[in-house]
Amino acid sequence: PVVGVTWTQAKAFSVWRTQIYHSWLEANGDLFVNDFRLPLESEWERAARGDLEQSQFPWGGPYIRNASGCFLANFKPMRGRYFEDGGFHTVKVYSYNPNGFGLYCMAGNVAEWCSTAFDESQYEFGHDMNSDYEYEAKDGDHPVKKRKVIRGGSWKDIGSVSYTHL
């Protein structure tokens, strides 16, 4: 997994990946496709749920351990106890089971950037039909206007920040 990248770097990777793919398509006589991009928060949430309705975690249940007592994702089980789940840092993507869409580590391991702008009021005033708030901050904007949504939690976050929905 990739860690330590800014939102700008993640977005730049999407642009680079689009250019590489379009070059390959052009060389093979294929048509261009949609650009690669960071997901909207609502898109990330649906992808993380794996098509399960209102599922708290990608694996479908409210628990962070399976029946054998093993953790179902790589996140900090409790305060200051990083080692308890066997993942003292990031782990290989295939270390845990995929969700219903076949996506791995949608909770824990590394957090994911979304293209949605972060604003504390968006959850109070947002609408179910279009809950994503997009704002392209300008260089001179206040830092508060430059915040972006991060979802999924990471290996160093407790399980409650790894929920698939808010």
Indicate where each model-derived feature is located.
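Conserved small/polar residues in nucleotide/adenosyl-binding loops
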Residues: 164-165
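Functional-site microenvironments in short loops/helix caps that host divalent-cation chemistry
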Residues: 1-161
